[in-house]
Amino acid sequence: MTSGSKKRKFSFIDLFSGAGGFSLGFTQAGFEDRLAIEIDDSAAQTYKLNFPNSEVWKRDICSIHSLEILEEASDEIDVVLASPPCEPFTAANPRRKKTPFERFYEDPQGALIFHVSRIVGDLSPKFFVIENVVPLADSDGREIIKEEFRRIGYNKIHFNFISCEKYGCPSYRNRLFISNVHLDVVPQKKKKVEEVLLDLPSPSYPNNIPNHFRIPFPKQVKNEGIGIRKGHADVYFKGSSRENRNWTKLNEKELAPTIMGKSRFIHPLENRPLSVREQARLMSFP
């Protein structure tokens, strides 16, 4: 490469892209997105809105051949990102199957991770990162993953367990990042709820902030949340191994609880549910 030539950016594809949180982090780090794959129509449309210049396929990953990806990318793929569904593995799911073997091989959603390994094996990227919940690697789950990646030529993989609140996320969030590289992340100052919510105007009044509008309480929340103390919840429900809380009133001086698929929160200073934008900020979306 000559001094006057343009340096090539590292490229990535995003499997199970959702609205694009994983892609956002990598593009902010200077990587170039080549393709996003997402089966959910609303999520795929949101991704396209967030990344208007990106190619988005609203398709089932099970039906996609790796050659199609290579043809679309028209160049080497450096990184494969993947966030397959966590429902088969999370302890918050009361219908989670009993053993890791059943979760990977009998649950159709759990088996999707093998389509990730199929594509990784075909594309041979410089590195891959698979994000999911920590229980995916419970007991035999870790050995199932190791054996699958040994089969496609990756003899050593790393199970990177990261507590995201130590790296700037304003809510407790323990995540697993499976990769062929060890992720060495520099800790950041913890952020409290007030640092990410209280600069927003009340959604009761007109504003031009995306997804920041007032949401009514559902009928199951008693007295529209009146009387709930900070840090306490109005609704409790059973997961596969523990009791979970919902409609928790946040404490602005603390971190938010772990956000799950159906988690909803009450504003710490106003008696109302959080807006969609406020909820996103608790997960460190801008």
Q: Which residue ranges define each predicted feature?
A:
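C-terminal target-recognition/interaction regions appended to catalytic cores
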Residues: 212-286
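Flexible, glycine-/basic-rich loop-and-beta segments that form/coincide
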Residues: 168-222
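Core alpha/beta nucleotide-donor-binding catalytic domains of modification enzymes
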Residues: 2-124, 134-138
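Short catalytic/ligand-binding loop motif for oxyanion handling, primarily in non-cytosolic enzymes
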Residues: 23, 87-92, 136-139, 168-171, ...
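Extracellular/periplasmic catalytic domains that process cell-envelope and extracellular macromolecules
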Residues: 73, 170-172, 250-253
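Short clusters of hydrophobic/aromatic residues that line enzyme substrate/ligand-binding pockets
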Residues: 64, 89, 169, 197, ...
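Conserved Class I SAM-dependent methyltransferase catalytic core
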Residues: 108-171, 177-180
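Short gly/ser/thr-rich secondary-structure transition/capping motifs
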Residues: 60, 159-162, 238-243
